[in-house]
Amino acid sequence: MRTAFRLQFSAVDHGSKKVKNSPAFSHVEALAPASSANLGAGFDVFGVALGALFDKVSVDVVKVDKKVQLFVSGKGSEFIPTKPEKNTAGIVAEALLKASGKNCGLIINIEKGIRAGSGLGSSGASAAASALAINEALGLGFTDKELIKFAALGEIAAAGVPHADNVSASIMGFFTAIVSHEPFDVIRFPMPDNTKFVIATPEVIVETRKARSVLPKHIKLSDAVHNVARAAAFVAGVLTNNLTLIGMGMNDLIAEPYRASLIPGFFDVKKRALEAGAIGVAISGAGPSVLALVDSSKSMENRVAEAMKEGFEVNGIHCEVVIAKPGPGARIVRREEK
C-alpha cells in the first residue's frame, strides 16, 4: 500500500541549478532525527520528527571515480547491510553522486542511534542525514523538498519501494504531511508547544516489508471515511493548537487492526496509556514502537511511560521508553574544506 513516485532529476538536469565542478567540502557530518510516520489516521502521509534519537552520517569526498564505500557503527549496526545498494544511505549516496556528474568517490560512515526495525524511521534518518551531508559536501544546492525525493529512494532498501513519510519529517522537522506525489509536495507545521510523545519500543523486530504484507488490499468505504475524518481532525488540531483533536486523529481503522497482531500486548499497552492520561495512542510507523500523545503542561508523561512499560511487561515483553518533543529536522554539524 505504499505510493511510489518518480525521481525527476538526471545527471544533466540539476533542477536548473549551477553546480560547481569541484566538491565544496572534503568532510561533512549531519544529524537526522528519528521520526514517527502515519500517526494514526495519516497512513503514508503524516510524519513527525522526534527530538530524542538521532543517526549521524559522516561523508568524506575522495579521489576515487564515482565509488561509494559504506561503514556502519552504533545501535544494531551488526544487522545493517554495508553494501551501498542494500543500504538506505548508500542508495541515496549513489543517486546523488550520479546526479552531480562529479568524478569523485564518497566514503559514508553511519553512526546509528536509532534501532533498525523499531518503527522510528531508522532507515529514513540515515537516508536523510546522508542526503543532507552529500548535498553540502558536493555543493549541489538541492532544496529540502528535492532532497526528500532522493532520501525516499533510499527507503527502497527497507520497504521495497520509495516512500517519503519518514524522510520528510527527518529532513524538514516537526509535523509534515505529504499533499501530493505527482508532482511531489510536502508541507510542514510546528506542533503545539505542550506536545510531548511517549514512545515505548518493545524488544520485538517488525520489518517494514512484513508490516506492509499484512495490510488488506481492499478496505471498507466506512473505514476510509473514518480515517479521512480523523486525519482532518489531526491537521485541525495542529493548526489550532488543540491536542484533543490531534489525539482524535490518532485513531486508525486501516492499518492498526492488522499490524497490531505483530506487536504482542499492543491493545493492553494502548488501554493502559489512555487510562494513565494519554490523549491518543498509535502504532509508530510499521511498529513495533507505540506512540502516545501527552500534554506536557499536565506532567503526565512519566505516568503514561510507566503504564506503557507495564502493559508490555505483563505480556512478557521488555521495552525501552523514550519521551520526546517534536523537533527540528536534519542539520549539518561539521564541515571541513579541502
Predicted regions and their residues:
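Short, conserved charged micro-motifs
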Residues: 65-68, 208, 298-304
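Glycine-rich, charge-dense phosphate/pyrophosphate-binding loop(s)
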Residues: 238-338
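Acyltransferase
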Residues: 193-271, 275
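Gly/Ser-rich oxyanion-binding loop with an adjacent helix/lid
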Residues: 103-183
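A generic local secondary-structure boundary/capping motif
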Residues: 44-48, 156-161, 165-168, 184-190, ...
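ATP-binding N-lobe of GHMP and related small-molecule kinases
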Residues: 5, 11, 15-118, 132, ...
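Short beta-strand-to-turn element immediately C-terminal to the catalytic PLP-Schiff-base lysine
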Residues: 60, 170-181, 292-295, 333-335
